[in-house]
Amino acid sequence: MPKILVSAGEASGDLYASLVVQELRRIMPDAEFFGCTGPRLRAAGVRTIVDSADLAVVGLIEVVAHIPRIYGEFRKLLRAAREERPLLAILTDSPDFHLRVARKLHRQEVPVVYLVAPQAWAWRRGRVREMRRTIRRLLCIFPFEEEFFRRYGVPATYIGHPLAGLVHPALSREEFFKKHRLAAERPLVSVLPGSRRGEAARHIPALLDAVDRIYREQAVNVVLPASATTGVAFFQERMGNSPIRVIEGESWDAMAHSDLALAASGTVTVEAALLGTPMVTFYKVTGVSWLAGKFLVDIPFYSMVNLIAGRAVVPELMQSQMTGENLAREALRLLQGGRDREEMKAGLAQVKEKLAGRTGAPGRAALAIQEILEGQVTHVS
């Protein structure tokens, strides 16, 4: 029975890796999977060695504070790899953790497939040297990444975005509004503060202020879909008298039926783009992390939507710009409709076209992994 180590450090990676595992089970039904898991990987039958919730930390300074715990999980995962001797490892996202894991696995002669490329094109470009040495195949989910990494000698393949063709609502707008007792005549705003508790806690105060300001100007429905990694109670404890309705999951339904999303920069903005939902993006880290990042990051935009488009399609309110006043101003402008909203929707449609033009990413990833296991490493077309 072949064993495969699978590791995902955050919610999006947990989803992407679980889709690949499901495809692998179809072509390798006798394979056994173990590793660092979130709820989706566990649901896909991957045996847990480390819980990915213990790795969900963002920001340079924030990571430093959690190094002892993260190092303990790192050692636990590598100990399992030594004992179980997997034929291959699939590492997903979370590069600060997984590139170190890749280095150790390379020494154990375990082939490493890396799913979701580290953003070396944006910062810390020196990481490509380590990747070239330790990674057997890099599976890229954005169209511009393959060329960048191949230029540096990393064996990269663009497989398409795992969410392309997958993101869609389960309920109609009428069903969603009825289920959550929303006023049918009011616009719907989704609040998406991030899938990690640390980042969500930093964003909540400004978002609460923004919603209060919006509510004073326009009657709206507001929902906050809580991810499995944060939980409903985490947000309910922080809502006070806010009109925000916290719901469990259902983020795709919420975004699909929203007139606007207030979205933390990350995977959720790609999901909103695939659903065609206008949005205002934001993000905030600690002051020290922000200053350090300003010296290290070399990209024109922070939002992946704008990076894919190659232009400013959605507003970006980063760090000190992320205030309730600024969020509310941008939100009200877009809720009013008109030219700005239509131009954004046209830009989002172009982003969707770029991503949705290559569906079936999990299947292509599974075939690439199968080829490596069979010793037939070829370019996946």
UniProtKB/Swiss-Prot annotation:
- GO cellular-component terms in the record? membrane
Say which enzyme class the record assigns.
transferase
Q: Name one GO molecular function term.
A: lipid-A-disaccharide synthase activity
Q: In which pathway does it act?
A: Bacterial outer membrane biogenesis; LPS lipid A biosynthesis
The family this protein is said to belong to: Belongs to the LpxB family.
Q: Per its database record, what is this protein's job?
A: Condensation of UDP-2,3-diacylglucosamine and 2,3-diacylglucosamine-1-phosphate to form lipid A disaccharide, a precursor of lipid A, a phosphorylated glycolipid that anchors the lipopolysaccharide to the outer membrane of the cell.
Instruction: Return the protein name.
Output: Lipid-A-disaccharide synthase
